[in-house]
Amino acid sequence: MSEKLSKNVILLSIVSFLTDISSEIIFPILPMFIASLGGAGLIIGLIGGLSDSVSSILKVIAGYWSDRIGKRKPFVFFGYGLSSFSKILLSFSTTWHHAVVLVSLERVGKGLRDAPRDAILAESSEEHRGRAFGFHRAMDTSGAIIGSALSFVLFYYLGLSFETIIFAAGIIGFFSLIPVLLVKEKDKKPVKSSLELSLKALPGDFRMFVIIASIFALGNFTYMFFILKAQNVFLILNPAMAIAIPLLLYVWFNIIYAAFSMPVGTLSDRIGRRKILIAGYGLFALTCAGFVFSDSLAAFIVLFALYGVAYSLIDATQRAFASDLISENIRGTGLGTFHTVIGLAALPASLIAGSLWQYVGPDATFVYGAGMGILATALFVLYSLKSNN
């Protein structure tokens, strides 16, 4: 049995690699760019929350329509193209109002492409789906590492303006469309049913998994709180390094995440995705608990590495496992539903974490994350036992 990756998997992974280089060039400077346009902290939060909401809601709709017309590639191409075009326009923004519209439009592109793209990945890798999704996430994260480094070089060393950097990132994004053109879909019959009927056709095992994954997502708050915890510690230990060290730790997290994603995907094909997810949810809980007690550079190096391993165990494996549970004719709808529910759960997750951080204390945020990780682990173990029986 060959483990060779299919052409579609490689092409779509290159697409995500280039797109993440483009996006991660922009993300580190976006808050400063918005502030330079007159947007205060509330506006920055509004842009982040609104864009995520728009993206999440569209995913189930795009997934359904890719099933309905029997074509996924047009959604992938148009989604990536819209995101790149929005980045170009963002570079010409003169007020924060423009930024609100254009960042949201960029997320519309993400909402259109994610579920159909994941459906193509699943349909192109029936035997080694975990390996395929793992490779895709590894390429995606590798692009994020390069993009973040380029942003730092372009801004701090070359002294380029926000507008020039964002424009250049948009151009890089357009190069991601070339591999999409080479993707070849399998022939599929259009599914002539309403969205409501397609949702009702989703199997019970899949629905239960989405519930458990969304419970985990409620505790899987934004990575920024992990960075803030490190920054708070180093403001006391070494104020001069309070910004540099947390950023380097974030890069370290991404390196570990990228390094483990493909091996974990391959392992999930061999030993089963249930074991990988149980390990991932449990390790996330352990990592959050560790952040409660961390107070040294050595501790943070270990914990950010564990955070990266946990993400590699969870992210691609959840997508592959969800794909396993859905028949091909409604896979776009199913993966769109999965992405939508997880995306919507992520919003209150960070609001709860932020409220605990501000009103109770930083440690409370990580206690909450550990608790939700333990709950998700327990529920998934019960789910697996019931499914096996």
For each predicted feature, which ranges?
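Juxtamembrane intracellular "pre-TM" segments in multi-pass secondary transporters
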Residues: 1-6, 185-212
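Transmembrane alpha-helix termini and helix-breaking/packing motifs in multi-pass membrane transporters
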Residues: 32-36, 146-164, 348-364
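Residue-level signature of mid-helix packing/kink "hotspots" within the transmembrane helices
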Residues: 52-60, 144-145, 254-262, 343-347
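Helix-loop junctions at membrane interfaces in 12-TM secondary transporters
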Residues: 89-103, 292-303
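Cytoplasmic helix-loop-helix junction between adjacent transmembrane helices
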Residues: 102-142
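C-terminal membrane-cytosol helix-exit motif in multi-pass small-molecule transporters
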Residues: 170-189, 376-384
